[in-house]
Structures are given as C-alpha cells and as structure tokens.
Amino acid sequence: MKTVLSLMAAALVVAAAIAAQAPAAVQQAPAPDAWRNFEGSLSASGQRQTLPTESGRPAATVQLSGPVAITAGEGLSRAFRSEAIGFDDGAGLTVLRGVWTDDRGDRIFTRLNGETVASGRRIAATITGGTGRYAGITGEYSFEWQYVVEAEAGAISGRAIGLRGRYHIEGTRK
C-alpha cells in the first residue's frame, strides 16, 4: 500500500512538472478577413427640408454630421466624423448614404435604410467599402435614435444608441 501511494505521489509530481513546462495557450488574433464585431454611439446634427405629399406625410431630405465613438471591438479607429445625406419619400422609404472619416483621413462608406429619422426609430446600414486602411471593408450595423429634436428653420439633432455591427476586410489589410 505504501508503495502504491509513493508511486501515485511520484506520478502527480511528474504530471505537475510537465504541466508547468507546457507552453501557455497562445491566443491567436483573428484572421485579417475574419468577421469582427463592434459597438458604439453616435450623435448628429444638421438640416431637414420637407415637401408636402398627397399622403399628408411630408417627403424630406436630410443632411447630418457628427461624431461616432467606437466603444467595443478591435481594428477600427475609436473616433470618426460621420456625414450622411438622405431622402424620406413620406410613404415609408428612407434611404441615406454615409461616410465615416477617421483622424488619418481613412474612410468607411455606408448605405443606410430604415424608418423616418425620428426618436425611437431603427436604422440598418450596410458597409459598402472604404479607403486607406479600410480598403476592402464590408459589413453591417444598426442603431436606434434615442432622441431627435427638430428646431426652427429645419435644424435637426439627435443621439443614437445601440450602435452594433460587424465587418471584415478582404485580404491582408488591417
């Protein structure tokens, strides 16, 4: 019995020594073209011009700009300047085109679709391309307008919450 316990103790010591010498698991970075998730927030202000329609809901053009803050994820700048222009036909079709520009001048281009720009409305976007380090980027994101405030003379401003998306960049660019 004493021999069995000695052998078991020796086996445990050997196993512990082997485990201590084993290389630690290396956490690999995602492949350059792997899908990567991101989260953030955005605020925007600009102008909205409206035109009456037969439905009673006005058609509108909108031009917005403001900061985008990326709060989670990797591979993107943490801050962008966002610009968007778009059209709401007054009958439920809203289409916008946007561009995010980082501090180096590299850009991400987007196409946005959704409901009228108003509080509580959701917007879905497709990332359609980029320049510089974002060349070859594609993906998608969405957000909800937490609030949209309209002031006199067509001025509009708002804050979006729940900005979440994913992207990948073709090839070896990061």
Q: At which residue positions do the language-model features occur?
A:
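Bacterial N-terminal signal peptides
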Residues: 8-17
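Bacterial N-terminal signal peptides that target proteins for export
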Residues: 1-9
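Beta-strand-enriched cores of mature, soluble protein domains
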Residues: 22-174
